Amino acid sequence: MPLNAVARRSRASSSDAPPGPKRDAILRAAIDTFAERGYFNAQVADVARAAGVAAGTVYLYFKSKDDLLVSIFERSMREGLAGSRAAIADLPDPPERLRRLARGHLARLGSDRNLAIVFQVELRQSTKFMERFSSTLLRDYLGLIRQAIADGQREGLFRADLNPTSTAKMLFGALDEMATNWILSRRKYSLEADADAVVDLFLNGAQAR
């Protein structure tokens, strides 16, 4: 089944599946398996083996391998959104909100290399999949960045000529590239530690003169 078709059905299929430790274990096994073998090379049987369950058990929770990938994306994005909203809930200062969002973004990926590989590499091999979700969960995430930029403009902190939506995508793109470089690098270093440098460079360009 094509990924875009599964994406349209993912909300129903995931919500119908019983939650619990076994489902979580299967998702964790899918993350590790997709990262190690590559999504297209991995089989449901590989995921089942990594989770310590029978292949048929996977289908009790997920409709297909595609549904597993969609579920990884949705759960991780929802957790990321919730964490980001909580992190900036008590921060009125727009620049500090951007800094907190950037740190959280890189900290989440930096704490789980296999999840980062799935997000930065495996999910992006399907254009249809990315098109399906670019206007939903990802849009909501970008909205947090956009709102901080717009608030900064209203307070006279950021340049008035900046388009908040485009500027939010620029900052997200910079963080995204840092995550990809971290995956590909042979050096071991803290991904989160790069957040301040990215935000400082961004703020220097966005600051009202």
Positions of PLM-derived features:
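N-terminal intrinsically disordered/low-complexity leader segments
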Residues: M1-P21, R28, D32, R209
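Amphipathic alpha-helical packing segments from all-alpha helical-bundle domains
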Residues: R78-A82, F129-E155, T165-K169, G173, ...
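Helix-turn-helix
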Residues: A25, T33-D67, S71
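Short hydrophobic clusters on alpha-helical segments that form packing/core surfaces
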Residues: I26, A30-F34, H105, L175, ...
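Amphipathic alpha-helical segments used for helix-helix packing
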Residues: R97, L109-F129, N181-L184
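Hydrophobic alpha-helical connector segments
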Residues: S71, R85-N114, P164, A168-L171
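Hydrophobic/aromatic residues within well-ordered alpha-helical segments
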Residues: K22, K65, I72, S76, ...
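Amphipathic C-terminal alpha-helical segment
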Residues: A107-S111, Q147, D151, L171-Y189, ...
